[in-house]
Amino acid sequence: MRPKRHPGLGCAVASALALIGVAPAFAQDTRSGAPVTCANLKSVRVPKTVVAVAESVPAGQFRPAAAPAFGPPIDYSQLPAFCRVVGTILATAESDIRFELWLPEEWNGKFMQTGNGGAAGAIVQASLVDPLMRGYAVTNTDTGHQGAGGDFGWASQPERLVDYQYRAVHELTVVGKALTAFHYGREADRSYWLGCSTGGRQGLKEAQRYPEDYDGIVAGAPASNWSALMALSITIQRNLGEGGLGVDKLGVLKEAAIAACDADDGVADRVITNFATCGFDPTSLQCPAGPTAQCLSPTEVAAAQRIYAGVVDGRGQTVIPGTGFGSEPLWAAYASPQFAIGTNYFRNVVAKDPNWNPAAFDVDRDLARAEAVDNGAAKAMDPDLSEFVKRGGKLITYHGTTDGLIPYGNSVSYHEAVVEELGERRARDSVKLYLVPGMDHCSGGEGAFAVDWLTPLENWIENGEEPAALAAAHPPATPGPPGAPPAPASPPFTRPVCPYPQVPTYDGSGDVADAASFECVEPGGERPARRVLQIGR
């Protein structure tokens, strides 16, 4: 069933454009249904917006500004013909919100914005590729500054910080929809958000603060509990290296956790599926005599326990949980000078002191300061999605259980708070959480991490098909970014990804590489008879 066209479409478009102050001549063009050519989009007057580039790109001819900083290389050679718009939104006198909007010749009638990672600071062209291939008018922003993913040196300008926290995404939603309507002569039938990490946080913030912006939101591994997450970054950083846990021991911890809990689901596949009941204890690795490469000193055991515990305040209350068993190698990112995001955030935003030392971090004092400074601007933990749900909005959140940067337990806590706020029936009809066993941060990992999140969301909104178990695959080794060593070979397999709180459970006899041999079962529910099988790697 195709999405219904809006009644009185011309008037609706004209009204929407008038709200953002579009010049009457162009509003008249849109009312008449006359599309604006790609080149002429440079002349469309949208207040506070400057379009610097509006160019037609023939099929297969786009060349990106730079290779992606992480992830596999992107193949741009198969891109269809599209109109590429590059512009800037001057939301305030300090603002410099840069964006790209890609408008395909063969449009599917829908609009999408994609999210960012870390501290943003760049337009993520790679995130536009798949939506464009699907026919979306799709856009992305640098959120108002240029910089690396863990850098907050730009945040001394208060309005640019607000742009990053939430404003840039909303401003681009309005401007992107308007430019899309001009180009095609009508507004989009549906609007979608797709993002992970900071992009997941941005998606939740849209649902909470601007519930009318998007019909459907995919929020992966959301960095939603913002100040607490920055504190977790510092906690991990402080407990790694000299005087703590050696980075060279992170793989030892991961292997021990897998050995302790992998077979609990009946399949020894290096994926901990019963993650909630895994009872791995790092004291089992404590060296019985002198230190070796395969055991931990008492100091290292204590450091690992502190990281697993997450951020705990002076009353013994968990502020944000630690990351899951099997996620340990990813902790090293927070100890890297290139991604000491928590330290950079506290130095530039909270303490406003370039010499602030994370060794002096005090949970009770400094987290309270951070929450006061943020004042809910970046934080996206408000469980009241009633306005978003009331207008038919749908939300899919996903999170890998071996995400070592953002704990999946935070997504569980938020989802449960939303269910309590909305009530089980309304929540079931509008929000879904999927925990992906063995998936790292947003993608990758030992598990079946390749999932099409967008199609189930489209079917839910456009066809009324409520998503249940989704198909997930662990593909053969994929190439890393340019210059990276080749990924180790691993056999492909498939699994179902289950709506929380269900978990995938082996049927006891089928092919362990086939998702059909697994079913989604409520924790504590009746499970099929199981036997442990090995999957080689």
Model regions and ranges:
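Bacterial N-terminal signal peptides that target proteins for export
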Residues: 2-13
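Bacterial N-terminal signal peptides
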Residues: 11-22
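Catalytic-loop region of hydrolases
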Residues: 27-110, 124-126, 268, 272, ...
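Cap/lid segment of the alpha/beta-hydrolase catalytic domain
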Residues: 108, 117-188, 231-232, 239, ...
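A catalytic-pocket lid/entrance helix-loop region that shapes and gates access to the active site
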Residues: 161, 205-207, 212-312, 435
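Alpha/beta-hydrolase fold nucleophile elbow
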Residues: 186-197
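Glycine-rich nucleophile elbow surrounding the catalytic serine of serine-hydrolase chemistry
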Residues: 196-205
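Short beta-strand/loop motif that positions the catalytic acidic residue
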Residues: 397-399
